[in-house]
Amino acid sequence: MLARLLGRLGQSVLVLLVVSMVSFLVFRYIGDPTVSLLGEDASVAEREALLHELGFDQSVPVQYAGYLKQVLSGHFGISYRFRQPVTEVIASRVPATVELSLAAALFAVVGGVGLGVYTAMRRRSLVSRTIMGVSLVGVSLPTFLIGIGLIYLFSVELKWLPAFGRGTLVDVGGWQTGLLTVSGLSALVLPAITLGFFKLTLIMRLVRTEMLDVLRSDYIRFARARGLRNATLYGRHALRNTLIPVITIIGLQLGSLIAFAIVTETVFQWPGLGLLFITSIQGVDVPVISAYLLMIGLLYVGINLVVDLLYAWADPRLRRR
C-alpha cells in the first residue's frame, strides 16, 4: 500500500510539472501584457521597461524557473483586467464554484447510485424503463440546452426559481456563501441540476450495469439460497461489490465538475471560476487564464490520488500489494 502511494505521488509530481509547463507557455506567449497594462498609446521605452520588470527579456529556462518559484510561493501575477493579484481574483470566485460543484456532486452521486440500484433491482418495471428512457436525455442533450430548458420552465413560465445570480450572500469568515439564505439556496437549484444531470445519468447507468453483473454472480445466488434478507443481500453484499469498479469513474467524473462548470456558470451567469475563465479569455487576461489551467490540473491530480486510495480501501486485494 505504501509503495502504491509513493508511486502515485511520483506520477502526480510529473503530471504537475507538465501542467506547469503548459501554463507557463500560455502565460508567456499568448497576448501582449504591455498592451493590456499600458494601453496601445504607450511608448517603446515604457513597453521595454515593463517587459524587463516582468522578466520577459530573460531566457526561457530562466523565465520558467522564475515562474515555478512564483507559483510555489502562491503568486500568479497581476490580473490585466482587474488590476489585482490573480490569487485575490480567483479566491473571490472560489466559493461560488465550490458550492455549485458540491451541490451538483451530491445530486449526481445520491441520485445516480440510488436510481442505478433501483433500476437494477426492478429492471422490468415500468418505472425503471421510464427512468432509463429519461436518462437518454441527460446523455444526449448538451449541458447548455438543459440549462436553457430549465430556465424557461421554472423561471420564465412557472416563476418558481431565479434564472441567474447567486441570490443573497452571507459572509462567514471571509467565505461568501448563499447556503444560509433562502434566495441563495433557490438560486443554486437550477445550476446544480444542470451541472449534475449528465453525471447523474452516467453514474446511474454504470451502477445499474455493474449491479446486474453482481446479481448474476454465484455468491449472490448462494447468499439468496441461504435465506438472507433482501436488505442484507443488496446493501451489504451486492452494493459494495458494485461500487468497487465504479469508484474510479465516479471520482474522475465528479472531479471534472469544476472544469465543466464553465458552461453552466455562463448560462446562469453564476459568478464563479468558470465565468471568470470565459471573461478572461474574452479580455485576454493571460495571468488569470494561466492560473486557472494550473489550478484545474492540480485539482485533477489530487482527485486521481484520492480515488486511487479509495479504490485500494474498497478492494482488499490492492491493500495487500
Label for each model-derived stretch:
Residues 15-65, 154, 158-180:
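Hydrophobic alpha-helical transmembrane segments of membrane transport/permease proteins
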Residues 2-4, 16, 94-127, 143, ...:
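Alpha-helical transmembrane segments of integral membrane proteins
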Residues 22-30, 58, 67-69, 134-165, ...:
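Membrane-water interface segments at the C-terminal ends of transmembrane alpha-helices
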Residues 52-60, 77-86, 168-188, 281-287:
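Membrane-interfacial helix-loop-helix junctions in multi-pass membrane proteins
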Residues 12, 20, 43, 108-109, ...:
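Residue-level recognition of pore/gate-forming positions within transmembrane alpha-helices
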Residues 57-113:
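An internal, D/E-rich "acidic patch" concept
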Residues 44-75, 220, 269-280:
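Short hydrophobic, aromatic-rich alpha-helical segments embedded in or entering the lipid bilayer
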Residues 2-22:
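Hydrophobic secretory-pathway targeting helix
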